[in-house]
Amino acid sequence: MKPNYSIDIAINCFRPGGGMESYTFDLVRGLNAHGIKPTVFAAQIDTTIPEYRQVDTHHVNQKKIPKKLRPFFFSMQLAKLRQNRNIPLIACNPSDYADIFVCGGTHLGYLHNMGKTPNLLDRLIIRRNRTNYSTAKLIMAHSHLMQHELINLYGVPSEKIHVIHPPADTARFYAKPEEIPATRARYGFKDDETIFLFPSTGHTRKGLDLLAEFFEHTDLPIKLAVAGSPLPRPMDNVIELGFCKNMPELYRAADFTIMASLYEPFGLVGIESILCGTRVVFSDNMACTEVMNENAEIGR
C-alpha cells in the first residue's frame, strides 16, 4: 500500500558533491524504496541525475544574493516557499523549524579542531546554527562526537538528540575481487606499487598537507591517489584523479583508503571502503571509527 503522506527535504545543492549531498541521495533512495516520493527544496538542482526522477523539486532562487550570504537567506526563502504546507521537513542544511535536523557537523567543533579564531562570518554561522538547533523538533546527529558537541558547545538538551550513523549503500559498495586487476590497470596503478586512496573535497580539513609531507619524501613504492578536488600544486608520488563518479571501483582498486582529518564528524568513506574490501588507515579522531572494531571491520 502506498503511504498517504509526503516529506520535504531541504538541501543547498541537490547534485553530486560532498558528504551531505551524498547523504541526501541515500535518503531519497531510501524513501522511494518505502513508496515515498519526497519534495526537495534546493538552490541548485541537477536534472541529469537518477535521483531527480525520484523527487519533486522546488527551486530556491538565490541568483541575486551574494554567494557568501546565500546560506543565511536560504531558511527565510524556504519558509516562504513552504507556507501553508503541512508536511514534515527534514533539513539536510542549516534550515530553521525542521521536524528533523540532520547534524553532520558543527561550526564551533570545526573551528576548535582546525585551530581557527572565529571572524565575523564565523560568528554569523554560529548564530545561525543556534537557531537551527533551537527551532528543530528533533536533531539527528551523525555520531556520538556530534552529540557531544551539540550538548557541550551549544547547550542543546540531550533528550532532543538522537544518534543515527549515516547509512551506506550496500547495493553499490561491496567487494568484487575478480575485477581488481583490470580496474587497477585502467587507473594506471602498477602491480608493484601500494596505492593509498585519499577521497577528499576539502583537502585542508582532510589532512592532505600532512600526507603529502610523507608521500613526497619517501622512497617506498607507494602512491597517494587523490580523488575529488584539484590538488593545490603538483606533488611527487601523488596521483590526481579528479572527481570520480564510480567510487566503488576506485575503493576496490586501492590497497588502502587513508585520511588524516583534523575534523571528521563521521567519514562515510571509511565504511564504504571496508564494504568494498579495502582496509583503512585513519586518524583516531574520525567519528566513523565509532562503528569499527580494532581490526577496522564494521561492528554489529
Short names for language-model regions:
Residues 145, 167:
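Carbohydrate-associated surface elements
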Residues 279-282:
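Short hydrophobic beta-strand element within catalytic cores of glycosyltransferases
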Residues 284-300:
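Short acidic/histidine- and often glycine-rich active-site loop of Leloir-type glycosyltransferases
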Residues 262:
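Aromatic "clamp/platform" in nucleotide-sugar-dependent glycosyltransferases that forms part
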Residues 190-206, 212-215:
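Conserved donor-binding/catalytic core segment of Leloir-type glycosyltransferases
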Residues 243, 250-254:
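Short alpha-helical donor nucleotide-sugar binding micro-motif in glycosyltransferases
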Residues 267-270, 288:
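Short glycine/serine-rich donor-binding loops of glycosyltransferases
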Residues 151, 168-185, 192:
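Acidic anion/phosphate-binding donor-loop and adjacent secondary structure
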